């Protein structure tokens, strides 16, 4: 389970509030995970545990899934603040 210490913090990285950055964030996270899996070659158990955790987070629509945004989950209140989102 040594390799999980490098995979589990990836699930804690928050998604940006600005919807324009969601695509860039998901591409970065996808390429990071792909390069990690190709370079470090984690054991099968660690990879399955991580993929199960990723599936459960995305399936529950908590809003922290970096693969897509659930349309049922509302944006946080701070996402509508012009001082945070920008112009």
From Swiss-Prot:
It is found in: Cytoplasm; Nucleus; Membrane. It is a multi-pass membrane protein. GO terms for cellular component: cytoplasm; membrane; nucleus. The chain crosses the membrane at residues 19-39, 43-63. InterPro entries: BCALP (IPR009598). It comes from the Eukaryota. Keywords: Cytoplasm, Membrane, Nucleus, Transmembrane, Transmembrane helix, Tumor suppressor. Its main location: cytoplasm. Acts as a tumor suppressor; induces growth arrest at G(1)/S checkpoint and apoptosis via RB1-dependent and p53/TP53- and NF-kappa-B-independent mechanisms. Modulates expression of genes involved in the regulation of proliferation, cell cycle and apoptosis. Belongs to the BLCAP family. This is Apoptosis inducing factor BLCAP. It comes from Danio rerio.
């Amino acid at each position: 389970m040594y390799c999980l210490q490098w995979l589990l913090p990836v699930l804690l990285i928050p998604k940006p509030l600005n919807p324009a950055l969601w695509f860039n964030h998901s591409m970065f996270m996808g390429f990071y995970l792909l390069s990690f899996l190709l370079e470090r070659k984690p054991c099968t158990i660690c990879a399955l545990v991580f993929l199960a955790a990723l599936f459960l987070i995305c399936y529950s629509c908590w809003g922290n899934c970096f693969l897509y945004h659930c349309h049922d989950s509302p944006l946080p209140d701070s996402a509508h603040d012009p001082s945070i989102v920008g112009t």
